[in-house]
């Protein structure tokens, strides 16, 4: 089992140039990157970074959001052998925990900015190809 000890917001950007017209629709295609940082074998914690980017700062997209969040995780042995999770299983458990915190942060950030919050849909970690596994 994986537990998140804390999360740290490393970057948070919101640019809004939406025209207040309810008939205006645009597509939201978030780019999501998840990375597990290397750790020393004697370290009990693992650090993961998650980046979610909506829109682009370079083009004329009316909305741009970028959030980078870091999570500090600890693996807890589930049986008497004390065996910790394999990297692939760690990713499948750590990613949704950090993604949920990021989703909530993005919705809250938009609400504080006076916008209707975007509720990114949950992602099934079993359908993700974690590279490096």
Task: Write out the residue ranges for each language-model feature.
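N-terminal intrinsically disordered, cationic/polar leader segments
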Residues: 1-97, 104, 108-133
């Amino acid at each position: 089992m994986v537990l998140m000890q804390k999360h740290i917001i490393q970057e948070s950007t919101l640019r809004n140039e939406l025209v207040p017209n309810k008939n205006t629709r645009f597509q939201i295609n978030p780019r999501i990157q998840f990375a597990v940082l290397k750790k020393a074998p004697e370290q009990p914690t693992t650090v993961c970074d998650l980046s979610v980017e909506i829109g682009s700062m370079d083009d004329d997209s009316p909305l741009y959001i970028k959030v980078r969040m870091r999570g500090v995780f600890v693996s807890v042995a589930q049986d008497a052998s004390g065996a910790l999770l394999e990297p692939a299983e760690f990713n499948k458990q750590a990613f949704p925990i950090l993604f949920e915190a990021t989703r909530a942060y993005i919705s809250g950030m938009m609400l504080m900015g006076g916008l209707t919050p975007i509720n990114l849909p949950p992602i099934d970690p079993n359908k993700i190809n974690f590279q490096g596994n």
